[in-house]
């Protein structure tokens, strides 16, 4: 296919990219609400394709410690995807899922095994919801791996696909996600397809 610039691609596919974000967030909100037993609203203020090298500046300070839930994707497309969440939001969601009340977290970077497991499940639901929406829009079969979770600097987490798995691409789909419950939570879904898969996605949209 013709290799358009990112600005041209975002202009051409703005509606379908937003639809992927809206459908995915709606499915994720329903699933998470059922888990925590309270109403959850999710909004997608921003969806765009961008250079992988600019992801760090798009999501905030690269030296900031965040929670990252990471999965590989395969079959019709190859690449990786992740969901990033700030520490305060992570503790809030973990407390909700584990039914903890009035907990004071003195060490924000510390999560126990149960908390990490709960957050991994949240990340799995959100990434699976967006992935399902993308698969429906493109008629591509996209299979996720088992997720894993880590707490580290944003720059370190964003480098995982290339360092750990040799997955290399220069484009990413970034979906900014706002989760509205008792407090507002902002997270980022990122799909980083390999170069051939990137063009396959665009051809299928």
Give the ranges of each region predicted by the language model.
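Composition-driven recognition of glycine/serine/threonine/acidic- and proline-rich low-complexity segments
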Residues: 2-27, 31-205
